Amino acid sequence: MSNQALLETLNQTTELLSVKLAELAKLASMETNEDTEDCQLSVVTNGLMMVNNQTLQLVRGVQDLILLTRNIREKWLLTQIPEQLTPKEQDSINHEELTELLESCVSEIISDV
């Protein structure tokens, strides 16, 4: 997936989450003016079902957002890998320093998740 496609999907997912959260807040504050108990029970039941549905969609959106951010991080990390060096250049590499750098990058990424 290209960077532009990932960012577009990220924007769509955040917009969807915003809409679902607004709908969830609207459903949570829904009141009825009916006096009959059966009607109120029906409205409350329908309201709870709608809240459950909106919450489920919100959770799915957050899961999609987590997956997208992981893909973006992986893509960024893979683009940071340098080109393959010649044997002379490989001898001059400090492997201990590279190991420490890799461990610090991995720990930083893991701590963000």
Swiss-Prot record:
Compartments (UniProt record): Nucleus
| Range of residues in the leader sequence | none
Keyword rRNA processing set for record: no
Q: Which GO terms describe its cellular component?
A: core mediator complex; mediator complex
UniProtKB keywords: Activator, Nucleus, Transcription, Transcription regulation
Residue ranges the record marks as coiled coil: none
The entry sums up its family as follows: Belongs to the Mediator complex subunit 22 family.
What functional role does this protein have? Component of the Mediator complex, a coactivator involved in the regulated transcription of nearly all RNA polymerase II-dependent genes. Mediator functions as a bridge to convey information from gene-specific regulatory proteins to the basal RNA polymerase II transcription machinery. Mediator is recruited to promoters by direct interactions with regulatory proteins and serves as a scaffold for the assembly of a functional preinitiation complex with RNA polymerase II and the general transcription factors.
This protein's name: Mediator of RNA polymerase II transcription subunit 22
Question: Which organism is the protein's source?
Answer: Candida glabrata (strain ATCC 2001 / BCRC 20586 / JCM 3761 / NBRC 0622 / NRRL Y-65 / CBS 138)
Q: Which gene encodes it?
A: SRB6
